[in-house]
Each structure stands twice: as C-alpha cells, then as structure tokens.
C-alpha cells in the first residue's frame, strides 16, 4: 500500500489532526543510505515529522521546508526537505550507528541524536527571504522536540508522535506519525481532553502493525467526537537532484580546478547527499562546463 498523510478537523474546527503511514518512504531512505537501526530510527522520525510539517505549513507546490537537527549524539547531523506535494528527502551524517536498546526495550533515539543541540526549521515560500525558527533540543527523542518547536517558534499548542520499527536485519517494518494542532478558538478543556487521548495512544508503529489506517489513528486521537476528513495526500521519498543541477554548480569552479579533473582524473563524479545518486562527468562534459566561461 502506498504511503499517504490523512488530515482532519475536529471539535468545531478548533483542531487539526494529521496522521501518516510513511513505511515505504522510510524504507526507501534506509535503502538509499544503508542506515543501521539507530540511524534509521532518527532519520525516519525526522522524515515523518518533515512530511507532517510540510503538509500543515506549506501552501504552494514550489514551497520548501527544511529541517536541520544537530545534537551531540553519534548519528551527527540530520537534514531533511519536504514539499507541499508530499515528497521528502533527507540524510543522516553517520548512517552506520547501532546502539543498545533503551530501558523500555526500544531503539535509543535520544542517545543516538543527543540531548544537547539545536532543531531548526526553514520555510521557503518564494516570497522574501526564507524564515528559520530554531529551538534547543529538549529530549532527543524528536517527537517532543518537534512539539516544543511548534509551541515556541510557531506558537501552536501541539502534540507530535513519531515512530519507526526497525527489524533485526536493519530493514523497516513500519513507520509513521501524527500531529495534533490547536487552532484559534480552541479552549483548554478541549486541549486537555485530546492530550489525554494522545497519552494513552500506543506507538504509531504498533497501530500500523495492527492494521490501522491513518484515518483510524486520527479517530483514535479525536475520541468520541466526529471528525471532518480532508483530502489525503500521497507521500514518497523523492529527490530533485540531477546531473544538470550538479553541473551548474561545477561550472562555477575555477578553470584550473576543472582542468585538473580532466588531466589527473579523466573526469569527475559527484554524489547527492540527500538520495545517494551518483553522477559521472566525462572529459567532454567537463570541457563543456569550462566553455561556459568563454
């Protein structure tokens, strides 16, 4: 089944609820970057959060949202991009990190990411300069960190859940998440009731493994109150890199540097950090890039 994000309004449109099945998306990220369990969980959670933030905060097809997380844990930096059309991409600085399970028998994402560091979200909506909101990490588990970001940087009371189940062979069994946002008009009693529902909710990975859909997860969060479902959005890992794009960057290099690639290496090769795609440039390709300056 293809990945998607479901969304809905609840409580007289006082709340927005999003839920995502991102299993195939995170599987593709794991395959492309050959991530091990702790790195997979950290990158997967960040990709899911990025998809949810993009679905809730971007309006136009060309808008872009970028998440950068740098903690003091062994996975290093996490960088992800998301769009309003349901595509995400990203990478983790150190893909080969395995750690002992934490005290509750789960992948120790907090230790992998680190509890000291920063989470930054940049929105580029094509008007003016991109806007960046930044907060310190509060737990390293990431769901709590994104909840804190929404409260402090965007002034949105929210609850975020992120979950990736990694098999013993490092493959991804399921991945997904949810985001509850309070809208203008929401009162404290309503928020407290929904937060109570969230606190008793099993991990999203457990719900997905049991066969629940994103719509059913949303209903579990809403409780007995009716919900108004909005259009579902397909979700997938996709990168907009290309040989032409990297060629444009290489064309800005000094002639001497390009000539050195020709004379010493007989060409050049570059790898996209976000997706792992490799692009080869022959001598003829490099000569064509040099000719742009003439």
Swiss-Prot record:
CDD domains: Hsp33. InterPro entries: Heat_shock_Hsp33 (IPR000397), Heat_shock_Hsp33_C (IPR016154), Heat_shock_Hsp33_N (IPR016153). Pfam families: HSP33. GO terms for molecular function: protein folding chaperone; unfolded protein binding. Under oxidizing conditions two disulfide bonds are formed involving the reactive cysteines. Under reducing conditions zinc is bound to the reactive cysteines and the protein is inactive. Disulfide bonds join 239-241, 272-275. Keywords: Chaperone, Cytoplasm, Disulfide bond, Redox-active center, Stress response, Zinc. HAMAP family: HslO (MF_00117). This is 33 kDa chaperonin. It comes from Lacticaseibacillus casei (strain BL23) (Lactobacillus casei).
